[in-house]
UniProtKB/Swiss-Prot annotation:
UniProt-listed Pfam families: CN_hydrolase, Vanin_C
Full protein name: Vanin-like protein 2
Classification via PANTHER family: BIOTINIDASE, BIOTINIDASE-RELATED
Annotated signal peptide: 1-27
Keywords of this entry: Glycoprotein, Hydrolase, Secreted, Signal
Organism encoding this protein: Drosophila melanogaster
List of catalytic residues: 72 (proton acceptor), 167 (proton donor), 199 (nucleophile)
Length: 525
């Protein structure tokens, strides 16, 4: 009897292993995976946020997902920090610390939730670590002996912590940065390797762009609490940014998959989540304007099968809705010119505009929508260009070369880069928009399309034309235009965002000797 029992037990065990292996093989061979990104309105109570996370993980809408990504800073705070396992130790908090004697209870609970749902779960939290655990970091430590990090944590389907990333570029946050920047990736059972970073990191070479250039990563998870700026840095936008605006532009320029989860509090300027498939654009995206929400957005994401070329030779040193709060770019530093729009008439502009030695050529055509009615006002447009450092107090800086068309609520540059009142309406329909720029070559840089409509979402790739060609060792020719026959009447921003990071090894920058050291044969003085 006992012999039959053990035989049956071993048979069931073997059958279970075979079914599991078969399922993994099927997931690996599929040409897509199913992802969910969460737009989440946080509260001040950890217990309420945790309950909201669990409700989403267990929801019907999340059933088909392989991976779920939650936003930045929507779970715990400095008053409820937790230790986080080192991924190298392959620790499962749900099994190793079920009573939460070392890790905080919410971390254990989410480990169990990932295990019970059999999904990869990406969260962002406020982490604590003992300073003594990093003896190589000789920087001063807090009096309590702890470092505090803004950290992504990834659980696999069993609840094991398989990856951890600590934010490099803090956005004015009273937290620590790591002694050396981290590059974090994790592999999945569906055959995709993800890289990850957090919010403000997207504007810098390390780690976001570096993972693409030096490791060939094609898929990214991206928790964020983005504070939008006009006109290019809404999540989707050009000179200031809205979350979705920058998300789509970054995914498009790098031709990678991006799973972006955003905090949802439009009153303070937080919103913007989406799933993006490189040059194909948005698979799902949302930009809340009136009120926050707690929702999951799901899409099937096509896999990139071809391996990317990697650069191994780089040596790195260390809405128009008044209820949406948005920051403003420093447009007074731009060279700009107002479009002369006559009511009821057709207009056009063909002009070069320069800021210092950086120039852009604009070709625009528009059709007036008629004379303004007595009880409404209309926004105007300017073309603008800027080359220089993007500076905000107490933040990491980067060097940008931007040019584009953007809206204003009046005739002065001081009236630009602000959310427009609901009563303002578009005065023109653009029938042609084209920008041509020659950008200098650099060791590290990223050029991407930056657009925004009055619903705070960007134009999709099917609505525009983009080309970037290397025309010499020193320069790239970029052309960005509306699709032929397409007309747009709700345009807030249309431009090219040139991010040159630290501007090192850029052609024409520095002495002749420095340019020769960067590999340029004919340096420009």
């Amino acid at each position: 009897m006992a012999k039959n029992y053990w035989g049956f037990f071993l048979f069931c065990l073997a059958l279970g292993l075979m079914l599991n292996l078969s399922q993994q093989a099927s997931l690996f061979k599929r040409d897509f995976y199913t992802a969910g990104v969460v737009e989440f309105e946080p509260s001040n109570e950890l217990s309420d946020n945790l309950a909201g996370y669990l409700e989403i993980i267990q929801s019907q809408n999340a059933t088909s997902t392989d991976i779920i990504v939650f936003p930045e800073s929507t779970l715990n705070s400095a008053g409820s920090t937790t230790f986080v396992p080192n991924p190298e130790d392959q620790i499962n908090p749900c099994l190793s610390d079920p009573n939460a004697t070392y890790y905080e209870e919410f971390l254990v609970t989410l480990s169990c939730a990932a295990r019970n749902a059999s999904k990869y779960i990406v969260i962002n939290l406020t982490e604590k670590q003992k300073c003594e655990d990093i003896p190589e970091d000789t920087r001063p430590c807090a009096s309590n002996g702890l470092n505090v990090f803004n950290t992504n944590v990834v659980f696999d389907r069993q609840g094991v912590v398989v990856s951890r990333y600590r934010k490099v570029h803090l956005y004015g946050e009273p937290k620590n940065s790591t002694f050396l920047p981290e590059l974090s990736t994790f592999e999945t059972d569906f055959g995709v390797t993800f890289g990850h970073f957090i919010c403000f990191d997207i504007l810098f070479y390390t780690p976001a762009h570096q993972l693409i250039v030096e490791q060939g990563i094609t898929d990214f998870v991206y928790p964020a609490m983005w504070f939008s700026q006009l006109p290019f840095l809404t999540v989707n936008g050009i000179f200031s940014s809205k979350a979705v605006q920058i998300q789509l532009g970054w995914s498009y320029a790098n031709n990678v998959n991006l799973l972006a989860a955003g905090a949802s509090d439009p009153i303070v300027g937080n919103s913007g989540s989406g799933i993006y498939h490189g040059r194909s654009g948005s698979l799902r995206s949302v930009m809340r304007q009136e009120s926050g929400e707690r929702s999951i957005y799901v899409a099937r994401v096509p896999k990139y099968r071809a391996k990317r070329r990697m650069k191994r030779d780089l040596k790195r040193q260390v809405a128009t809705s008044s209820s949406f709060n948005i920051k403003r770019d420093y447009l007074e530093n731009f060279t700009s010119e107002e479009l002369k729009i006559d009511a009821g008439k057709i207009g056009n502009l063909s002009q070069n505009l320069c800021h210092g030695g950086f120039c852009c050529h604009f070709d625009l055509a528009w059709r007036s929508l008629g004379k303004p009615s007595r009880n409404t006002s209309h926004y105007s447009y300017r073309v603008g260009i800027y080359e220089g450092w993007r500076n905000e107090k107490r933040l990491d800086v980067n060097y940008i070369r931007n040019c584009g068309v953007f809206t204003c609520s009046g005739n002065s540059i001081d009236d630009c880069g602000q959310l427009l009142p609901d009563i303002q309406r578009p005065l023109v329909t653009f029938t042609h928009v084209e920008i041509r720029v020659t950008y200098p070559q650099s060791r590290e840089f990223l050029l991407f399309p930056d657009t925004l409509l009055d619903n705070l979402l960007p134009l999709e790739p099917k609505q525009f034309e983009w080309s970037q060609k290397r025309i010499s060792e020193e320069s790239h020719q970029v052309r960005f235009a509306l699709r032929k026959s397409l007309e747009v009447k709700h345009l807030l921003t249309f431009g090219i965002y040139g991010n040159y990071y630290n501007n090192e090894c850029t052609f024409g920058v520095g002495t002749a000797e420095e340019q020769l050291e960067c590999g340029y044969k004919n340096p420009k003085i």
